[in-house]
């Protein structure tokens, strides 16, 4: 709701406290604010524009003349921060201490808003992020606000039906687990599950914790081929989580208009990706059929409309081809070749038409593994082959695409030197891990740099 608004206009900071405005004068105040915010000739620099646009839209006020968002700009300059309070930005970038508390603190900070804007704008220009800011990030602000306001319609009846199906599926899976273990126990209890797996069923102990046997996802994955109950337990965990987080969870956040209004966060991830919260609608697992069923409860607003799902084809590899300038990979894409089949043909030394689905699958793992900085050991684990075979696959790959290895090495060196890497549009991805004295953490940093 519209609570307080702080405005620096004509070198004067004003605080509008809407809670103190009586009903008689509230319409007049709203109309004055509307005239100010909708005046295109008054250029506006806003701290957290999406939030303000979202709030004002509810009061039928449009924001015109919005030229700069200090939060988004500060995020582009340093995406490693968790948040970007105005007084902190002024302290860090303008070397000014902002004094006071509450309203006084914010008003004192607002007094330096113009100076902060000029500093951030200059940094964005000097660091070559003007295209990224003005053509990508700034236009996105109003789009995200609109997305949040519209929301995503949900078929409540379908969701209720799904709740029944999940309850039945969970019950059925529980019975199968009990039958395989020949007793009932609390499957959700790591302690009880550990005793069943490692004492009663005598499965090999992979890892121990202070409280007993570890039964985390990594441990269960390694036990998959040891007993049929393990796969059932992994499935049970998936569907119970899906049920609590999405089936029951979504019921609680459906608004009066029949839609779910998630928040889309532009300044949270270090990579520039969006994040979704309250609830997270970007991470609904689709590995199992029950997960795919959840997506079907989302429907278009109009019955005559359809939901369209689009995805880039092999985008990571296309970007890699562009950034590395590897002629062989660029040529493969320009001739519309299936890059995974092409790689399989090279790795396994067979004609393209003789590449089997298994060969293509392994080549795909190599292609994407290289992008994410995979080691020969990890590749051997993923493909269930020897480390020597994995190393040979990677060697053949780099022989076929010679510029890629050099490019990836240069990216790692740049990250070590600068502490960050750059994307095509000069977005900075800060990687503090790469300067760690811990070898494992440093290796993670190198993979993140290539990623």
Predicted regions: what they are:
Residues 22, 61-63, 96-104, 120-130, ...:
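Short, polar/flexible loop-turn hinges at active-site or ligand-entry regions and domain interfaces
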Residues 79, 187, 332-334:
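Conserved, non-catalytic sequence blocks in retroelement Pol enzymes and Pol-derived host proteins
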Residues 2-22, 309, 316-349, 433-436, ...:
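Metal-dependent catalytic core segments for phosphate chemistry
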């Amino acid at each position: 709701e519209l609570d307080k608004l702080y405005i620096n206009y004509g070198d004067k900071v004003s605080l509008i406290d809407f809670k103190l405005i009586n009903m008689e004068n509230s319409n007049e105040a709203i109309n004055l604010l509307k005239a100010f915010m909708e005046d295109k000739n008054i250029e506006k620099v806003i701290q957290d524009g999406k939030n303000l646009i979202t709030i004002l839209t509810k009061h039928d006020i449009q924001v015109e003349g919005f030229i700069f968002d200090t939060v988004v700009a500060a995020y582009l300059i340093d995406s490693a921060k968790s948040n970007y309070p105005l007084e902190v930005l002024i302290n860090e970038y303008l070397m000014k201490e902002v004094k006071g508390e509450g309203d006084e603190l914010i008003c004192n900070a607002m007094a330096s808003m113009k100076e902060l804007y000029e500093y951030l704008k200059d940094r964005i220009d000097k660091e070559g992020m003007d295209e990224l800011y003005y053509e990508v990030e700034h236009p996105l602000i109003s789009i995200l606000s609109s997305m949040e306001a519209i929301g995503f319609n949900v078929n409540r009846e379908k969701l209720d039906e799904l709740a029944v199906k999940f309850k039945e599926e969970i019950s059925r899976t529980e019975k199968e687990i009990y039958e395989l273990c020949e007793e009932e126990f609390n499957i959700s209890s790591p302690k009880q599950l550990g005793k069943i797996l490692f004492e009663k069923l005598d499965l090999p102990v992979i890892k121990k914790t202070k409280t007993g046997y570890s039964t985390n996802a990594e441990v269960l994955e390694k036990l998959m081929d040891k007993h049929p109950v393990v796969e059932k337990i992994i499935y049970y965990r998936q569907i119970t989580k899906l049920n609590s987080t999405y089936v029951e969870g979504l019921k609680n956040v459906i608004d009066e208009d029949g839609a779910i209004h998630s928040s889309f966060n532009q300044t949270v991830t270090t990579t520039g990706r969006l994040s979704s919260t309250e609830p997270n609608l970007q991470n609904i697992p689709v590995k199992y059929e029950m997960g795919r069923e959840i997506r079907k409860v989302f429907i278009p607003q109009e019955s005559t409309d359809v939901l369209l799902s689009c995805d880039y084809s092999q985008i990571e590899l296309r970007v890699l081809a562009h950034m590395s300038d590897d002629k062989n990979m660029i040529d493969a894409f320009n001739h519309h070749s299936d890059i995974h089949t092409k790689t399989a043909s090279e790795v396994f030394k067979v004609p393209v038409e003789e590449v089997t689905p298994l060969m293509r699958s392994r080549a795909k793992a190599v292609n994407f593994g290289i992008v994410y900085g995979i080691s020969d050991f990890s590749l051997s684990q993923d493909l269930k082959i020897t480390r020597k075979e994995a190393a040979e696959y990677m060697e053949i790959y780099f022989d076929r695409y010679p510029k890629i290895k050099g490019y990836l090495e240069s990216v790692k060196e740049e990250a070590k030197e600068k502490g960050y890497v750059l994307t095509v549009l000069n977005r900075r991805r800060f990687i503090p891990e790469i300067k760690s004295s811990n070898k494992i953490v440093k290796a993670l940093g190198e993979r993140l740099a290539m990623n």
